[in-house]
C-alpha cells in the first residue's frame, strides 16, 4: 500500500522508522525512482538553507524532519562533500556507523552508512556551534553505484555531483540542560561545627583557627555573638594550660598576691573562725594539703611568732618537731648625742619585713602584707593545734 498524499495518513500515525527501514524502504526506493511506502519525505537541497528554515519545507514532522537531498563535491576532482549551508556549515562528529540488514545471518550485509553532523553559524574554523543536529544516511557502495545509473535532470551535474540522493533527519537538541545540584552551605559546615559544646574535647585554638571558627559560625547563622565566642575561646585556652590553681581547690594562689593579700585575708580569717570542726578540717585539708603551701605558712608564721611572743614560737617549734632559732634583732645602729655607746633602734615589723634580704626564695616571694600575716598567724595556730591532736 502506497500513500501518495500525506493528508491521507490514518489517525494516530507516527513516523518513527529505524535506521535500517530508512535505508531499505525509503532511500533505496528514492535512488531507484521507485515509490516509497509513504510520500512524507520531501526532496529538498538542505545545503541551500539554514536548518531553522527547513521545517517549513517538509511534508510531515513535528520534532524531527526528513528530507531527500543531493550532495555536491567540495572540489571538482575530490570525494569530500561540500558542507556549506546557508549562513554556516555542517561539521561531522564522530565516525561513520554502518547499517546492517537484519534478515538473518546469511543476509546480514551492510546496506548503508550513518553520519552525525552539527550545524555551526559563520565560517570555518571560527563558527558558533548551534543545537541543530543532522543524521545523514547514504547507501552502501554497491547500491550507490546502481542508483547512479539514473539521475534527475534538475540535479544532474556530472562535474560536481557526489551523490544524487541522501536521506537526512534533522532535529534541534533541547538547550534546557538540567542544572547541577549545588549542595547547601550547612552540608559543608557539618564536618566542622562552630558551636562549642560542653562535651567537646578541649583544645587551645590559635588566632587563625579562632578567626576561621568565627567566620564559619557567622556564615551558618548559628553564632550568638563575637563577645561570647571570645569568652568561650579564652575559657577553653585557660582550661588547657595548667596553673597553680589546680593545687588549691577553693582558693587560687593568684588571689594571695592581688592587692597585697587583702582580698585573700578575709576568706582565710573566716575559715580560721569556722565553728564547725568537721567542715573546718575539710577546708584546711584542701588549703594545706600541698607541701609548698605548708612551707609557706611555716616560714611566715614562725617569723611572726618570734616577733610577737617568744614562748609561742618555742611551743610551736617544739610541737612541730623542728628547732627554730630566734631571729636576730632587726634595726639600725644609732650613735647617741652624748658620745656614749651606740644603741639599736628597733624597726616596726612591717619595715623589718620590707628590709628582709632575699636569702630564701620562698620567704622572699610570699611577702604579701600585714593583713595576710595576721591571717597566717591564726591559721598556723589552728594547724599546730590539729597536729598536736593528731600526735596525742
From Swiss-Prot:
InterPro entries hit by this protein: NAC-dom, NAC_dom_sf
A GO cellular-component term linked to this record: nucleus
Tissues and organs where the protein is expressed, per its UniProt entry: Expressed in leaves, nodes, internodes and mature seeds. Highly expressed in roots. Expressed in leaf sheaths, flag leaves and inflorescences. Expressed in primary and lateral roots, particularly in the vascular tissues. Expressed in the primary phloem of the culm and leaf sheaths. Expressed principally in the primary phloem and in the peripheral zone of the leaf vascular bundles. Expressed in the floral tissues.
Keywords from the named record: Abscisic acid signaling pathway, DNA-binding, Jasmonic acid signaling pathway, Nucleus, Transcription, Transcription regulation
GO molecular function: DNA binding
Location of the region described as Disordered in the Swiss-Prot/TrEMBL record: 317-345
PROSITE patterns: NAC
Domain NAC: 9-173
GO terms, biological process: abscisic acid-activated signaling pathway; regulation of DNA-templated transcription
Subcellular location: Nucleus
Induction: Up-regulated during leaf senescence. Induced by treatment with methyl jasmonate (MeJa). Induced by salt stress, cold stress, osmotic stress and treatment with hydrogen peroxide. Induced by treatment with abscisic acid (ABA).
Domains: entry comment: The NAC domain includes a DNA binding domain and a dimerization domain.
Additional remarks: Plants overexpressing NAC58 display an accelerated leaf senescence phenotype at the grain-filling stage. The gain-of-function mutant plants ps1-D (T-DNA activation tagging) exhibit premature leaf senescence phenotype. Plants silencing NAC58 exhibit delayed leaf senescence and an extended grain-filling period, resulting in significant increase in the grain yield. Plants overexpressing NAC58 exhibit a significantly reduced rate of water loss, enhanced tolerance to high salinity, drought and low temperature at the vegetative stage, and improved yield under drought stress at the flowering stage.
The protein's name: NAC domain-containing protein 58
Taxonomic source organism: Oryza sativa subsp. japonica (Rice)
Amino acid at each position: 500500500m502506497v500513500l501518495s498524499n500525506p493528508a491521507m495518513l490514518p489517525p494516530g500515525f507516527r513516523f518513527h522508522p529505524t535506521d535500517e527501514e530508512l535505508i531499505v524502504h525509503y532511500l533505496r526506493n528514492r535512488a531507484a525512482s521507485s515509490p516509497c511506502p509513504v510520500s512524507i519525505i520531501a526532496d529538498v537541497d538542505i545545503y541551500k538553507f539554514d536548518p531553522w528554515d527547513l521545517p517549513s519545507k517538509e511534508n510531515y514532522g513535528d520534532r524531527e524532519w526528513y528530507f531527500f537531498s543531493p550532495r555536491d563535491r567540495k572540489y571538482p576532482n575530490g570525494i569530500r562533500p561540500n558542507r556549506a549551508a546557508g549562513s554556516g556549515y555542517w561539521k561531522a562528529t564522530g565516525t561513520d556507523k554502518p547499517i546492517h540488514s537484519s534478515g538473518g545471518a546469511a543476509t546480514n550485509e551492510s546496506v548503508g552508512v550513518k553520519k552525525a553532523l552539527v550545524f555551526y553559524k559563520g565560517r570555518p574554523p571560527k563558527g558558533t556551534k548551534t543545537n541543530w543536529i543532522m543524521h545523514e544516511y547514504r547507501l552502501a557502495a554497491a547500491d550507490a553505484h546502481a542508483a547512479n545509473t539514473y539521475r534527475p535532470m534538475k540535479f544532474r551535474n556530472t562535474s560536481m555531483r557526489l551523490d544524487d540522493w541522501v536521506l537526512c533527519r534533522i532535529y534541534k537538541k533541547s538547550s534546557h540542560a538540567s542544572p547541577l545540584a549545588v549542595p547547601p552551605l550547612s552540608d559543608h559546615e557539618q564536618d566542622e561545627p562552630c558551636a562549642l559544646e560542653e562535651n567537646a574535647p578541649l583544645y587551645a585554638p590559635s588566632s587563625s583557627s579562632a578567626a576561621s571558627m568565627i567566620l564559619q559560625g557567622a556564615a551558618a547563622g548559628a553564632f550568638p555573638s563575637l563577645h561570647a565566642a571570645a569568652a568561650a575561646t579564652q575559657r577553653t585556652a585557660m582550661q588547657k594550660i595548667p596553673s597553680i590553681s589546680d593545687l588549691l581547690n577553693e582558693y587560687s594562689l593568684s588571689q594571695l598576691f592581688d592587692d597585697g593579700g587583702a582580698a585573700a585575708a578575709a576568706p582565710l580569717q573566716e575559715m580560721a573562725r569556722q565553728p564547725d570542726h568537721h567542715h573546718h578540717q575539710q577546708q584546711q585539708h584542701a588549703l594545706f594539703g600541698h607541701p609548698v603551701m605548708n612551707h609557706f605558712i611555716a616560714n611566715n608564721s614562725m617569723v611572726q611568732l618570734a616577733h610577737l611572743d617568744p614562748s609561742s614560737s618555742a611551743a610551736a617549734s617544739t610541737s612541730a618537731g623542728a628547732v627554730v632559732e630566734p631571729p636576730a634583732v632587726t634595726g639600725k645602729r644609732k650613735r647617741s648625742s652624748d658620745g656614749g655607746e651606740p644603741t639599736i633602734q628597733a624597726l616596726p615589723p612591717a619595715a623589718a619585713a620590707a628590709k628582709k634580704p632575699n636569702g630564701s626564695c620562698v620567704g622572699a616571694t610570699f611577702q604579701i602584707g600585714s593583713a595576710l600575716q595576721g591571717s597566717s598567724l591564726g591559721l598556723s595556730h589552728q594547724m599546730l593545734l590539729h597536729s598536736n591532736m593528731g600526735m596525742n
